[in-house]
Amino acid sequence: MASPRELTQNPLKKIWMPYSNGRPALHACQRGVCMTNCPTLIVMVGLPARGKTYISKKLTRYLNWIGVPTREFNVGQYRRNMVKTYKSFEFFLPDNEEGLKIRKQCALAALRDVRRFLSEEGGHVAVFDATNTTRERRATIFNFGEQNGYKTFFVESICVDPEVIAANIVQVKLGSPDYVNRDSDEATEDFMRRIECYENSYESLDEDLDRDLSYIKIMDVGQSYVVNRVADHIQSRIVYYLMNIHVTPRSIYLCRHGESELNLKGRIGGDPGLSPRGREFAKSLAQFISDQNIKDLKVWTSQMKRTIQTAEALGVPYEQWKVLNEIDAGVCEEMTYEEIQDNYPLEFALRDQDKYRYRYPKGESYEDLVQRLEPVIMELERQENVLVICHQAVMRCLLAYFLDKAAEQLPYLKCPLHTVLKLTPVAYGCKVESIFLNVAAVNTHRDRPQNVDISRPPEEALVTVPAHQ
């Protein structure tokens, strides 16, 4: 039996790992968050205008945000790339042999790219977005998954509410490249005929015939669900997420606390109170929220003094969330960037090299913070109008989820003090309005410096530090 290897601590993530010949061994899992022992293929099912692409995009965004490398493969886009000009619904008629041939080629091309992503490029989850309305087509895709060692999970969206279908056609399909420069009524008529092309051959997932498959059926945008044979942790998280999202129009308001006493001094973390300008912002925020006349607004804060002081000025009930507390800077709490450079120059450089994954000694990383904030995202997806009064790093993580920003971009998103971001979910994304409330505040945003080498001179390490007292 081999003797246990010596351990060393990874300087970036502060994770203990074996080492040999004076160098750390490769970590057991190098592909982001390992939640499954094999890749997962998510297969969308449903007629056109049932929200499949909406679900695909949201699911892809969520999984990437929690650290699971995920990519969406929209077969409609493959078809548009192959057939540059869309003429009419006749392309989708079941007896259109040329159309059938092209659509099959597009599906196969998408599956080849799925295989490349999951088997060669280190992907964990692929979302195959197409109608997949026949049992024969789904069997072909399932066999493809089995042959390549993937777990297959079907997501079917069923909608019989005419109002929801009509709204989906107007919001999404008429903005499709297929209908650019087409009359609205003409486009609607054509799209309705396109749906008819699929209806006669549509075979929904069946509790008896498909009892061996893993799937979730979503009825009328979340009115009810059927879940069958959830196979692993990643599938259970997918189900949990899909059971929390809704399409009710709403807005989410994100802002930081008012300027704090430590903000003025350029010190990070701590639990300070508001500065005079911070208290002024809290009053302005109260007026802004009152002027917006938001129906059934919920207000959330962290459990830190500065967010609670900000919320108190609103004069409305609010809920404190410990998970909304600012990132824990560990041994660097309440230090200025200059003091961190003086006392921990190696740590300061390592953080600049990979700000998302870097973990403060005895503290947290942005990666840790994202995992901590997942319950907040789930609850935000369930709620309607919410104001979240939080902190710079926390706001960056929440904003990255809604705007689909990569991990490398997340720690550098600009979230200035005394500014409210109004996020309004739209068809395939999120509309953002930035509202500055006309109360001056210090700048706390530090860009990544050009020189991130551990041997850099102090002046190059500190070149992007914002001015402070």
Swiss-Prot record:
The record's section on PROSITE patterns has: PG_MUTASE
- State which Enzyme Commission number(s) the record gives: 2.7.1.105, 3.1.3.46
Description of how activity is regulated: The most important regulatory mechanism of these opposing activities is by phosphorylation and dephosphorylation of the enzyme.
Top-rank taxon of the source lineage equals: Eukaryota
Q: Which family does it belong to?
A: In the C-terminal section; belongs to the phosphoglycerate mutase family.
The job of this chain, per UniProt, is described as: Synthesis and degradation of fructose 2,6-bisphosphate.
Protein name per UniProt: 6-phosphofructo-2-kinase/fructose-2,6-bisphosphatase 4
Organism of origin: Macaca fascicularis (Crab-eating macaque)
Encoded by which gene?
PFKFB4
